């Protein structure tokens, strides 16, 4: 990491940045509300964007095999998650992917569950799609968030939940869920036929010895009902590039997602 600059603080007040737009008249106001870091871009990424701009026309493109392979290699090397090219779908962002899944696997009025508090676009996206929002409240124990699994099961049964939008690692609480916790979630979803979306956009930022487990690595049976969402945007601080990917290992779920996107 020594070759990267984590010291220089760029002035972003005049760069039309969403994070700092409210600070133009108050430069001493600290903006800590969004996952957008004030580090200089990684030189290799910056140069790749410059090279592309100099060599290419900005028309419709297809996804090269090397891009799929980069995702395959990253997931295997960083998280022990083995996937195939045909299981990867690229999309503009995690939130648009959640919206696609809501439309593909639920009908208007169906119940969609989240663990609150959680990243606020989850609830907004569910409501904008005219679905019933079910909030399973996280409990604060031992200084961090925990899931009340009895209440989770009760919420799913009483509301006939069809879809569960899960955040792993958790935003904003920072919880890196254990494999045992993920196992319990998966067993409940399997028991009641709930499709789970696991937003793992912060998967590479597990710190202080904590290990992130991609949901589908915990139990092979989870691949039948879970959609994994991830992106390079948080890891490399490139949210403005609008890129993410979904990993769908159940072909039937994959086809339904594709139909909704078309």
Language model segments and positions:
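A general structural signal for well-ordered alpha-helical segments in protein cores
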Residues: 42, 46, 67-69, 182, ...
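Conserved core of the PLP fold type I
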Residues: 58-187, 204-205, 211-221, 227
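N-terminal small-domain helix-loop-helix segment of the aminotransferase-like
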Residues: 2-93, 100
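Residue-level marker for buried hydrophobic side chains located in beta-strands
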Residues: 168, 196-197
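Conserved core segment of the aminotransferase class I/II
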Residues: 47-48, 219-220, 224-261
């Amino acid at each position: 990491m020594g070759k990267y600059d984590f010291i220089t603080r760029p002035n972003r007040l005049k760069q039309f940045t969403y994070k700092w737009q409210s600070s133009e008249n108050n430069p001493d106001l600290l903006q800590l509300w969004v996952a957008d870091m004030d580090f200089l871009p990684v030189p290799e990424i910056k140069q790749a964007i410059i090279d592309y701009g100099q060599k290419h026309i900005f028309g419709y493109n297809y996804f090269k095999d090397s891009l799929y392979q980069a995702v395959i290699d990253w997931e295997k090397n960083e998280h022990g998650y083995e996937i195939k090219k045909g299981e990867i779908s690229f999309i503009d962002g995690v939130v648009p992917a959640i919206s696609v899944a809501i439309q593909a696997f639920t009908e208007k009025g169906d119940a969609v569950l989240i663990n609150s508090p959680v990243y606020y676009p989850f609830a907004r996206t569910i409501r904008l799609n005219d679905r019933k929002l079910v909030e399973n409240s996280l409990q604060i124990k031992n200084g961090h968030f925990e899931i009340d699994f009895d209440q989770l099961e009760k919420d799913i049964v009483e509301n006939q939940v069809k879809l569960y939008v899960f955040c792993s690692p958790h935003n904003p609480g920072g919880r890196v869920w254990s494999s045992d916790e993920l196992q319990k979630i998966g067993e409940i979803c399997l028991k009641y036929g709930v499709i789970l979306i696991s937003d793992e956009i912060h998967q590479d930022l597990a710190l202080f010895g904590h290990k992130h487990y991609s949901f589908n690595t915990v139990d092979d049976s989870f691949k039948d009902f879970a959609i994994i969402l991830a992106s390079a945007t948080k890891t490399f601080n490139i949210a403005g590039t609008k890129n993410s990917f979904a990993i769908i290992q159940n072909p039937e779920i994959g086809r339904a997602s594709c139909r909704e996107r078309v």
